[in-house]
């Protein structure tokens, strides 16, 4: 009798054996700003999931920095111990997708009646696509906005631009702002700092790469228009270099800034360390003649190990992190990013959370502006040669601007060298 009871007990325990899902994550912020709460929202999400799924435990390794995470993943991959669900580094997304490290989610999405693609921002969801297939889901997103020094504009009796302003509008503002204030023969005020030709291309109506991630020519008219526009802006500075110190002192009108930086430096305690000498806010980027008021949008992605033994649970956990409104609201509570769900980011609750830590009288960024900037944003390519090519282009265009070279002929020569370079990489 006792033997039978013991045998039945063993069978019961076997069926009730705990399932452990491995989760891969790094500490801190994905957006290179200070963050002490990255584990809080993950731990809350895990606790909720485990509560809803008795017998399931989520395990992760703490203390892995963003800088070390890619190497940690590579080591786990070689050991055959890749986590069931994991954060996907931007630099590894295309490699992992092409090698089949991440599960193609198309079938899981198609057979899940509760999953709706339209719940997500288009740019955020598209960031997780490879070769037309959904290989990862977005967890958090951050757009680049344009920082405007409202105090400097007010001093020069210039109104803050509206959401649909243009390159010409920006040029005129910069022309009025740029001046020698103290009469020592050197400029003291400037229009822009760190505004680049890439920012201009995004708003020119052109793109660096098409949907298949084939390189568009650097001799494309939109790219050339952006470079020539940058030359006009650069000429206003009369050969002087604009520095971060100029900006910090309140002597520059515009500077690109991520939403993560906006939230960090608008709230305590970091607001007392930066940009306290003047009033500032964020607006859209100006549009070229054939372009729109667009900017880059980055997303933190999560995928499922293609070799997971717990596909259904891994899918449920991935959805729990990325598609659950309660979990996504915690992005606003504990991170400097933005929720990937339209309903959350556009909500009054999200706006109230952002407003909580701001000084009285500070106006929170317009939620409709934030919504539109993300939905209509630009996704940068993730494949290996992209940043190498763009860095080479940065150097070439810097020479065009600094040495007063002809943009058309210089970019034709550059295009030939880049085409040859890419052919050698294949």
Regions found by a protein language model. Give the residues of each.
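Conserved N-terminal structural module of periplasmic/extracytoplasmic solute-binding proteins
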Residues: 1-95, 99, 289, 404-426
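Extracytoplasmic/periplasmic substrate-recognition and gating elements
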Residues: 25, 235, 272-342, 378-379
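Short, solvent-exposed loop/beta-turn-alpha elements that line the ligand-binding surface or hinge
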Residues: 106-120, 163, 182-190, 206-225, ...
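Glycine-centered hinge/linker elements that transmit conformational signals in sensory
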Residues: 173-174, 212-241, 285
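Paired acidic/hydrophobic, glycine-rich loop segments that form the ligand-binding mouth/hinge
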Residues: 84-87, 253-258, 263-265, 276
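Extracytoplasmic/periplasmic solute-binding protein
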Residues: 130-139, 144, 168-216, 252-254
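Long, aromatic- and glycine/proline-rich binding clefts that accommodate carbohydrate-like moieties
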Residues: 332-395, 399
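Hinge/lid segment of periplasmic solute-binding proteins
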Residues: 64, 88-143, 277-286, 362
């Amino acid at each position: 009798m006792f033997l039978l009871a013991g045998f039945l007990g063993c069978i019961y325990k076997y069926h009730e054996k705990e399932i452990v899902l491995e989760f891969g994550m790094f500490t801190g912020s994905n957006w290179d700003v200070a963050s002490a709460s990255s584990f809080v929202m993950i731990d809350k999400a895990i606790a909720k999931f485990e509560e809803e799924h008795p017998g399931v435990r989520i395990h992760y390794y703490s203390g892995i920095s963003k800088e070390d995470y890619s190497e940690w993943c590579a080591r786990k991959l070689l050991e055959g111990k890749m986590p069931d669900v994991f954060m996907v580094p931007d630099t590894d997304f295309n490699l992992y997708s092409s090698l089949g490290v991440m599960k193609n989610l198309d079938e899981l999405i198609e057979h899940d009646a509760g999953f709706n693609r339209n719940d997500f921002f288009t740019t955020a969801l598209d960031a997780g696509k490879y070769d037309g297939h959904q290989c990862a889901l977005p967890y958090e997103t951050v757009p680049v906005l344009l920082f405007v020094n409202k105090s400097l504009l007010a001093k020069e009796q210039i109104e803050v631009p509206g959401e649909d302003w243009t390159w010409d509008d920006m040029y005129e503002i910069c022309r009025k702002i740029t001046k020698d204030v103290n009469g020592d023969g050197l400029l003291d005020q400037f229009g822009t700092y760190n505004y680049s030709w890439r920012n201009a291309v995004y708003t020119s109506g052109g793109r660096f790469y098409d949907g298949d991630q084939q390189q568009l020519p650097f001799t494309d008219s939109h790219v050339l228009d952006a470079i020539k526009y940058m030359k006009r802006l650069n000429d206003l500075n009369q050969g002087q270099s604009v520095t971060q110190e100029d900006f910090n002192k309140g002597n520059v009108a515009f500077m690109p800034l991520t939403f993560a930086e906006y939230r960090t430096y608008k709230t305590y305690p970091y607001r007392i360390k930066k940009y306290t000498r003047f009033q500032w806010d964020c607006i859209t980027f100006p549009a070229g003649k054939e372009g729109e008021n667009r900017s880059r949008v980055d997303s933190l992605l999560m995928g499922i190990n293609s070799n997971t033994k717990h596909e259904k649970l891994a899918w449920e956990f991935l959805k729990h992190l990325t598609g659950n409104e309660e979990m996504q609201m915690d992005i606003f509570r504990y991170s400097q990013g933005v929720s990937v769900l339209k309903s959350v980011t556009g909500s009054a609750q999200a706006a109230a959370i952002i407003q909580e830590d701001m000084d009285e009288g500070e106006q929170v960024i317009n939620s409709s502006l934030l919504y539109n900037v993300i939905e209509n944003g630009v996704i940068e390519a993730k494949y290996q040669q992209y940043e190498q090519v763009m860095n080479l282009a940065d150097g070439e265009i810097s020479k065009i601007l600094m040495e007063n070279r002809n943009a058309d002929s210089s970019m034709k020569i550059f295009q030939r060298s880049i085409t040859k370079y890419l052919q050698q990489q294949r």
